[in-house]
């Protein structure tokens, strides 16, 4: 990846941490309302588990449509990098770029075709237009400010190649069943319904 193809550079404040209730947090993320999850080993384990669960739910499909041989993939909010590492492994001839606000959870030994940049996705993308074949954004609802969502989605579509694929994955905590077996009034439904 060309170092100029990225987002705005950040200062050293991204490395500062704060401890609270026995957990470590990124000070920048808390101060700027980027995300409120810890950045410690327990959080990395939680992210790995979430990746495993989503992989199983999605029948081990990283990208939903058949995309052939993508040349460039962008993973927005890559966290501990599990999805990006898998994408780099499945598409070894592809450049995979992961972006995350925290430098504390970057994969220790990433594949050679994976680069991770530290940046706040609440700022505008500086990538060139029509640059990526796939843009993946997963579990970003808590990390993108409400007033940024429209421009965030516009940025994603601007940097996608014509015919490229935008894949956004969020969890909607509303218990449902496609065959009607889960009904209102059942304990499992009531426990899982949103407040």
Features from the language model and the residues they span:
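N-terminal charged/capping segments associated with class I S-adenosyl-L-methionine
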Residues: 1-130, 134, 148, 170-182, ...
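Extended, non-catalytic structural segments that build the interaction scaffolds
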Residues: 191-195
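A short beta-strand submotif of the Rossmann-like class I SAM-dependent methyltransferase core
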Residues: 137-140
